[in-house]
């Protein structure tokens, strides 16, 4: 296999047995593809597909005026260029967006002409607000903060059949219901009641009999009965009654008389139940008529009206029950034929017929009025109003839309073959749904499972943005309709008609404050990726936490390969917020698909198909680990498969598909846990969630035991710098990399140089530090896609969230009781878990009523010492070390004139005015913070003079830009002259540049000329002269282009900043805070094994092995058995082997062994023991040495989930590293030097420091703010609150009998207002007595009792 630039430097030993059939897809595709589809940015006007913005415009336009004399049509749209790039937007606190310009056409028709002749056409581009752009990493910058739009998992539109699980009626009878859910519009529900009548609800309002809806659709009673029932035909001749026999219908009935065949042979005796055998005999005998007694008809329902043959009088309406009186009437009138409905109790119930009987309406108008009354109670119905309302409910494309998905699901569910159709409902649709519902009630067909992923679909960013945009457009449409009537008379242009505000507001509201637009979790690269791949069932149009039951939250068989069964939050959102599985993607309808390999007749091919949950149900799917031979045939007699959402076994020839990878079941975070297969699911859940909270450490350290997914996460997260084009590194320093692009990758007209500016010490959303470090050195060759610089938490292009620690599982003096962690001081000394946090502090100078606030170093009543870190503009220097309470930005605010005392007047008179009319409102460092100022940004509004500091910052930024552009020009120029040199070398000159005619050009000749002189050469060949001219032109153009670029940037920097109204100046100060690990910080492994650091011990006190190597961390062995996360033990053993091998390589390097010996040993490490084979033969000796140098600290291993290292392989690795195969060693107590009595498990585990730091939580209060009503101190660190002394604490003091302590707790220390003020005064005076009064909360209690109407008073003596 080919290794990339970074992979070559450090190869991970891979234990996987299964071949990679398919690479893990790009992890952010779900976000980027969806938004690309929405914008269709690159498409030309004719090639717009009917999705996204284009579809939204087309669904609202054309807008036609009320009179019909003017229309506004949509032609197309184009997106402008963003005003600022992403970094500038973050700095300035603005939205990264592009202007949207829409071309519309106003058509005015001639009123006079009869056939609507066109009188006038005006076309114009209209500005429709800004559309936020997605950054290349799948985020949006909204008001300067990075946000992510989380995808939503909602119920797919379509029709669903369900029952109430017997909960509605006390008898436990199942009541079936059908619900038609459109993409937008009214919901339509059909439901049975306990008496088996069918009712309809629209938008969950009051229910009406379902027949009312059918009548409103124009069906008569007879048509309804014809649609839903078959009929039995009876012939009457005199006193005799005969039935046209359909033998199947008799099944299960009891014979009322003997049934004979034509020969008179009895087939069924009277009183016997008719069985399938009897029916067969009847069919054989060919009995067509059956004589039945007259009472056989009684109780049956007529299917058609019975009409008097002579007079035409209607004897009985259809749907009437046959009674004795009616029979006599019918016989009298000599009616020869009656039809009754065929119903029975088994599979053909009389539900619709019963419903028609309770229906009070008799014609279409009455039904429409009834529906109108239900929808608009209290309004007087008119015929027109009722018709309009009903038609708008389900049959108008403006109000109702099933969408393509909904139509596809609808048609499939009611058994139609075509999947396309209209977005509105038709009569037939509604009748088909009712038919299907009745069939299900009759026992034919089954109800749907709403948690099946075939019935839930994913709405991504693009779709949600489109819906929001459409909402805005519909608001615009109303306004435009009003104005269009004026346009005819007043000759308005399209621009005057369209007000873009509603659209812009709708878009802004969605991106800024929708529940699904979330502040990006930027703790580390993994948390970013996971956040973008999250799928939430909450949000608008989704579920709510309170209403979601257990079924929705549960793992469903269809989650396999689509949604991760492990990664979900603990707490109220469990199961509602999920993560996409590693290989999952959405199809065009928004259903999640998973990839499978095709299997034919037991032979596995490499063809891959993506299937949705519905499509995969009929397939027989083998696991990725199914045993195969070299010819890719399945060799087991029975293969473990999934079929019809069940796990079972089948023969190899029945298998149709096979998983592509064992890790396709889990999400990215879960696939980063080695030995996941040995962990209990609950702990694995905690493990995958806690990796997202790991804080990037000062020096990233790759995990010794990984899973091989680390590289994918680091590459796709966008925190690393990836080469856009291949080439040679021209220059590199800490903050930028310049690449001279290889010739074959340079398109014509492009510059042959790429400049990558690295992100240095920038604040992330979680206040952690984003910093990139170059990995390449000058002269290195890189390919497209190679990683050139590491970001936070990445090490040589691999994700590195924590540190490899030498750990021992042993109890140690109770310091690791209850999951506590005991650390060695060495961990702190080596800065293993030191993290850098960056805080942004903002100072805003506003224009107040009394005058402008001023940022200045001249602050009243502040000593020199406090100002020594400020410059003359009153802003702190970069690099200053500041502590709590230090001034960062000096600011004074004018204060109102107060009445002056005579003394003050005297002072005023002596010292002038300034001294006292301003107050100090400087920005100070908050309590408990100590750090270094690393950056200062100054923003000044237009028209306000910029201070010296702002100008200095601007000059520095311009120098940076100029340096970049000069560098680019230097390389472009260099490359051009190189190309010219190779073209001119050996050619003959025709004169010019001081050279004689006929001179042959050599390198020396060219070196003797200045570059400017080269263009004066006249060559003998015309082609060369042309090339020289072209080169000269190219260089001039390039210079001009770069100068324009510089001017553009300069203009942007020098224009005033767009600040909020009333704000004159904003100063942002960035503080870098270094946090070492300390007791109280939370740490965790990757297996859900979390704990709090309890003590940091000196190195000499830690347990050590026979060689004297101390351990770094001591963990409690009791944390393992009950939690069943054995993966951590296996990781510890394999980590020990990895480290041991590294030390062995280190010894070989120290002894300066030959490269050949190293090659042999490395081959043994990589290829002898299980797993993937690495081809080291293609490495040069230098590359082998470089590789060995990077392996000194440990050979990194990959043990992919469900396909990882086996126990015997771990033992073999330990043996190869000359370590005990048990993974246990004898340890000695560091304090006494005595041996511990049992060998202890020692090894290397990857530990993370989580973003729950004691510094952020530690808090103490002296006096502070109080709650308004109860007068008790507030709670929480943010409010500078106190500690709650709750009821259990009160009991504790009561149990001790500490009466006075209890009294002061409940009074002067809490809410006795007078007592606490007095106490404060007393303490100041040195008098420590207290006089407790009445606690305020007691007064509140009295008031509350009074509010119940009980007069309560305290009797005070």
From Swiss-Prot:
A Pfam family matched in the record: RNA_pol_Rpb2_2
Keywords: DNA-directed RNA polymerase, Nucleotidyltransferase, Transcription, Transferase
One cellular-component annotation, GO: DNA-directed RNA polymerase complex
Catalytic activities: RNA(n) + a ribonucleoside 5'-triphosphate = RNA(n+1) + diphosphate
PROSITE patterns: RNA_POL_BETA
Record EC number: 2.7.7.6
InterPro entries xrefs: DNA-dir_RNA_pol_bsu_ext_1_sf, DNA-dir_RNA_pol_bsu_external_1, DNA-dir_RNA_pol_su2, DNA-dir_RNAP_su2_dom, DNA-dir_RNAP_su2_hyb_sf, RNA_pol_bsu_bac, RNA_pol_bsu_CS, RNA_pol_bsu_protrusion
Record flagged with keyword Nucleotidyltransferase: yes
Superkingdom of origin organism: Bacteria
GO biological process: DNA-templated transcription
GO molecular function list: DNA binding; DNA-directed RNA polymerase activity; ribonucleoside binding
Function, in words: DNA-dependent RNA polymerase catalyzes the transcription of DNA into RNA using the four ribonucleoside triphosphates as substrates.
Xref: PANTHER family: DNA-DIRECTED RNA POLYMERASE I SUBUNIT 2 (PTHR20856)
Family the entry assigns: Belongs to the RNA polymerase beta chain family.
Assembly and oligomerization: The RNAP catalytic core consists of 2 alpha, 1 beta, 1 beta' and 1 omega subunit. When a sigma factor is associated with the core the holoenzyme is formed, which can initiate transcription.
NCBIfam families in UniProt: PRK00405.1, rpoB
Name of the protein in its database record: DNA-directed RNA polymerase subunit beta
Organism of provenance: Pseudomonas putida (strain ATCC 47054 / DSM 6125 / CFBP 8728 / NCIMB 11950 / KT2440)
């Amino acid at each position: 296999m080919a290794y990339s630039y970074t992979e070559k430097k450090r190869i991970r030993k891979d234990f996987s047995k299964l071949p990679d059939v398919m690479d893990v897809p790009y992890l952010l595709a779900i976000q980027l593809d969806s938004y690309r589809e929405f914008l269709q940015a690159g498409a030309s006007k004719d090639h717009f597909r009917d999705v996204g913005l284009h579809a939204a415009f087309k669904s609202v336009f054309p807008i036609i005026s009320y009179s019909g004399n003017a229309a506004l049509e949509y032609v197309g749209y184009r997106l402008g260029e963003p005003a600022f790039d992403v970094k500038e937007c973050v700095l300035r606190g603005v939205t990264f967006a592009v202007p949207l310009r829409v071309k519309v056409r106003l058509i005015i028709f001639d009123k006079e002409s009869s056939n609507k002749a066109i009188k006038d056409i005006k076309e114009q581009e209209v500005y429709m607000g800004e559309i936020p752009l997605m950054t290349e990493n799948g985020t949006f910058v909204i008001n300067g903060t990075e946000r992510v739009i989380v995808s939503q998992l909602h119920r797919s539109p379509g029709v669903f059949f369900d029952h109430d699980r017997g909960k509605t009626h006390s008898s436990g009878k199942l009541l079936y219901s059908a619900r038609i859910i459109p993409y937008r519009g009214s919901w339509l529900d059909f439901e049975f009641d306990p008496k088996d009548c069918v009712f309809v609800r629209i938008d969950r309002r009051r229910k009406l009999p379902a027949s009312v809806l059918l009548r409103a659709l124009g069906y008569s009673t007879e048509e309804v009965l014809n649609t839903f029932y078959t009929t039995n035909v009876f012939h009457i001749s005199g006193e005799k009654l005969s039935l046209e026999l359909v033998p199947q219908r008799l099944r299960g009935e009891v014979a009322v008389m003997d049934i004979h065949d034509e020969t008179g042979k009895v087939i069924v005796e009277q009183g016997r139940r008719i069985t399938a055998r009897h029916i067969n005999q009847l069919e054989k005998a060919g009995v067509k008529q059956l004589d039945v007694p007259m009472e056989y008809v009684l109780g049956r329902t007529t299917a058609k009206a019975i009409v008097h043959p002579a007079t035409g009088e209607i004897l009985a309406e259809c749907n009437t029950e046959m009674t004795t009186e009616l029979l006599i009437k019918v016989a009298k009138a000599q009616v020869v034929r009656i039809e009754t409905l065929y119903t029975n109790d088994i599979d053909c119930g009389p539900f619709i017929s019963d419903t028609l009987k309770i229906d009070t309406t008799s014609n279409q108008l009455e039904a429409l009025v009834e529906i109108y009354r239900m929808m608009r109670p209290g309004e007087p119905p008119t015929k027109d109003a009722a018709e309009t309302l009903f038609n708008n409910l389900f049959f108008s494309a403006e109000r109702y839309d099933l969408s393509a998905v909904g139509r596809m699901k609808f048609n499939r569910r009611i058994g139609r073959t075509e999947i396309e159709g209209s977005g509105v409902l038709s009569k037939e649709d509604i009748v088909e749904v009712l038919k299907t519902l009745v069939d299900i009630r009759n026992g034919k067909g089954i109800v749907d499972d709403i948690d099946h992923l075939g019935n839930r679909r994913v709405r991504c960013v693009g779709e949600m943005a489109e819906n929001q945009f459409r909402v805005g457009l519909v608001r615009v449409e109303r306004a435009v309709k009003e104005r269009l009537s004026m346009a005819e008379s007043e000759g308005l242009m399209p621009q005057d008609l369209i007000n873009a505000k509603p659209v812009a507001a709708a878009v802004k509201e969605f991106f800024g404050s929708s529940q699904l637009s979330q502040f990006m979790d930027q703790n580390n690269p993994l948390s970013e990726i996971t956040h973008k791949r999250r799928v939430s069932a909450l949000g608008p149009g989704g579920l709510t936490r309170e209403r979601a039951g257990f079924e929705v939250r549960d793992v469903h068989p269809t989650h396999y390969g689509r949604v991760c069964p492990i990664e979900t939050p603990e707490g109220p959102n469990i199961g509602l917020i999920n993560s996409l599985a590693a290989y999952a993607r959405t199809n065009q309808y928004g259903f999640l698909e998973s990839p499978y390999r095709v299997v034919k007749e037991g032979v596995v091919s490499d063809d891959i198909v993506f299937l949705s949950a519905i499509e995969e149900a009929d397939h027989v799917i083998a696991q990725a680990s199914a045993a195969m031979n070299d010819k890719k045939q399945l060799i087991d007699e029975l293969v473990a498969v999934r079929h019809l959402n069940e796990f079972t076994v089948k023969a190899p020839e029945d298998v149709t598909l096979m998983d592509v990878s064992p890790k396709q079941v889990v999400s990215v975070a879960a696939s980063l846990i080695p030995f996941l297969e040995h962990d209990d699911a609950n702990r694995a859940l905690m493990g995958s969630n806690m990796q997202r909270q790991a804080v990037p450490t000062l020096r990233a350290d790759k995990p010794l035991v990984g899973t091989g997914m680390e590289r994918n996460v680091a590459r796709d997260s966008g925190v690393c710098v990836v080469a856009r084009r291949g080439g040679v590194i021209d220059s590199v320093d800490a903050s930028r990399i310049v690449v001279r692009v290889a010739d074959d990758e340079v398109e014509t007209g492009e510059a042959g140089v790429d400049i990558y500016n690295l992100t240095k010490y920038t604040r992330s959303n979680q206040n952690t530090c984003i910093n990139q470090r170059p990995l390449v050195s000058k002269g290195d060759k890189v390919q497209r896609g190679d990683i050139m610089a590491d970001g936070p938490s990445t090490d040589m292009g691999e994700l590195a969230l924590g540190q490899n620690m030498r750990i021992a599982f042993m109890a140690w003096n109770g310091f690791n009781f209850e999951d506590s962690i005991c650390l060695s001081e060495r961990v702190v000394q080596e800065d293993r878990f030191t993290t850098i946090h960056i805080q942004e502090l903002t100072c805003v100078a506003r224009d107040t009523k009394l005058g402008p606030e001023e940022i200045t170093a001249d602050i009243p009543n502040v000593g020199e010492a406090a100002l020594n870190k400020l410059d003359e503009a009153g802003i702190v220097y970069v690099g200053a070390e500041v502590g709590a309470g230090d001034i960062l930005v000096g600011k004074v605010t004018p204060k109102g004139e107060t009445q002056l005392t005579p003394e003050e007047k005297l002072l005023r008179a002596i010292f002038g005015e300034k001294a006292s009319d301003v107050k100090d409102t400087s920005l100070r460092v908050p309590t408990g913070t100590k750090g270094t100022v690393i950056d200062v940004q100054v923003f000044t509004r237009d028209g306000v003079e910029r201070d010296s500091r702002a100008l200095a910052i601007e000059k520095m930024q311009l120098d940076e830009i100029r340096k970049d552009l000069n560098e680019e020009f230097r390389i472009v120029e260099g490359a051009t002259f190189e190309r010219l040199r190779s073209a001119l070398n050996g050619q003959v000159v025709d004169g010019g540049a001081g050279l004689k005619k006929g001179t042959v050009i050599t390198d020396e000749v060219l070196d003797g000329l200045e570059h400017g002189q080269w263009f004066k050469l006249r060559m003998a060949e015309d082609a060369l002269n042309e090339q020289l001219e072209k080169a000269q032109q190219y260089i001039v153009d390039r210079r001009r282009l770069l100068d324009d670029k510089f001017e553009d940037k300069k203009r942007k920097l020098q224009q005033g900043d767009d600040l909020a109204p009333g704000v004159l100046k904003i100063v942002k100060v960035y503080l870098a805070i270094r946090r070492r690990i300390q007791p109280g910080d939370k740490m965790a492994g990757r297996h859900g094994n979390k704990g709090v650091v309890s003590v940091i011990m000196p190195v000499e006190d830690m347990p050590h092995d026979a060689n004297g190597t101390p351990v770094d961390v001591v963990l409690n062995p009791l944390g393992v058995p009950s939690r069943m996360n054995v993966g951590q033990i296996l990781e510890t053993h394999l980590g020990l082997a990895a480290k041991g091998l590294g030390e062995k390589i280190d010894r070989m390097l120290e002894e300066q062994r030959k490269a050949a010996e190293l090659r042999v040993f490395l081959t043994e490490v990589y290829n002898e023991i299980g797993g993937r084979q690495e081809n080291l033969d293609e490495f040069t000796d230098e590359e082998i040495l470089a590789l060995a140098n990077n392996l000194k600290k440990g050979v990194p291993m990959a043990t992919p989930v469900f396909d990882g290292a086996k126990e015997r392989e771990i033992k073999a690795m330990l043996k190869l590293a000359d370590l005990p195969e048990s993974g246990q060693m004898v340890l000695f107590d560091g304090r006494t030097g005595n041996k511990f009595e049992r060998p202890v498990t020692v090894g290397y585990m990857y530990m993370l420091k989580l973003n729950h730091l004691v510094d952020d939580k530690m808090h103490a209060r002296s006096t502070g703010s109080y709650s308004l009503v109860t007068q008790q101190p507030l709670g929480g660190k943010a409010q500078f609150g106190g500690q709650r002394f709750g009821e259990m604490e009160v009991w504790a003091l009561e149990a001790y009998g500490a009466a006075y302590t209890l009294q002061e707790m409940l009074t002067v220390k809490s809410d006795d207002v007078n007592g606490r003020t007095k106490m404060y005064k007393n303490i100041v005076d040195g008098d420590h007595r207290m006089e407790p009064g009445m606690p305020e909360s007691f007064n509140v209690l009295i008031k509350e009792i009074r509010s119940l109407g009980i007069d309560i008073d305290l009797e005070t003596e």
